[in-house]
């Protein structure tokens, strides 16, 4: 993927106030960040979609370590641009039991500054591999994805205390790195 300097998102930085959001998870339950933060810290994951083997590997490892994350006083929430029918495929592949949220219109992703436009050449390459990003994400003219990112948001204060943000989608924060950052 080719990104110009102007198009490159930077993500939010440590000590930034985490933008509140309200969305529906795969179980039809409303998740509101500020309500979750009353009782626990939040590990917020942005992932590209069920078609991405790197995302699936990360989400599966997080599911396998979910109890350890909970023991550290945190809840895990994952955000994707993919529509609910594709989220069900993510669940099949990863066994994820934590909230997976379809970010309709990418409002959450934009608030966290992780969104970028996918160039036409890349969209075409994915389409040739039977991955229709526009259809999966409910997008019409342009296709957008998130930079895979992890934010740890502090309980009560709601500030970002850890971030992992890397344009190289093959590189992800390890579960151990996330656990080490949870107090």
Regions found by a protein language model. Name each.
Residues 5-34:
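N-terminal "domain-start" segment that seeds a small globular fold
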Residues 18-19, 41, 147-149:
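Short loop/turn microsegments at loop-to-beta-strand junctions
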Residues 34-62:
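Short active-site neighborhood of thiol/selenol oxidoreductases, capturing the structured segment around
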Residues 37, 70, 143-145:
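Extracellular/periplasmic catalytic domains that process cell-envelope and extracellular macromolecules
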Residues 57-113, 117:
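Structural microenvironment flanking redox-active thiols in thiol-disulfide oxidoreductases
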Residues 106-168:
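Thiol/selenol-based redox catalytic cores and closely related redox-interacting motifs
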Residues 169-183:
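A short, polar/charged loop-to-alpha-helix boundary motif
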């Amino acid at each position: 993927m080719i990104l110009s300097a102007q198009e490159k998102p930077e993500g939010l930085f440590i000590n930034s106030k985490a933008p509140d959001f309200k969305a529906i998870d795969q179980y039809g339950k409303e998740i509101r960040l500020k309500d979750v933060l009353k009782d626990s810290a939040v590990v917020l994951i942005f992932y590209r979609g069920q078609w991405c083997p790197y995302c699936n590997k990360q989400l599966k490892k997080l599911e396998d370590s979910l109890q350890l994350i909970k023991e550290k006083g945190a809840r895990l929430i994952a955000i994707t641009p993919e529509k609910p029918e594709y989220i069900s495929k993510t669940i099949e592949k990863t066994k994820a039991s934590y909230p997976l949220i379809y970010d309709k219109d990418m409002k959450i992703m934009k608030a966290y500054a992780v969104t970028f436009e996918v160039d036409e050449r890349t969209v075409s390459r994915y389409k040739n591999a039977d991955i229709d990003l526009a259809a999966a994400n409910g997008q019409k003219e342009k296709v957008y994805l998130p930079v895979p990112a992890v934010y740890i948001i502090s309980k009560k204060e709601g500030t970002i205390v850890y971030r992992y943000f890397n344009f190289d989608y093959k590189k992800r924060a390890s579960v151990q790195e996330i656990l080490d950052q949870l107090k």
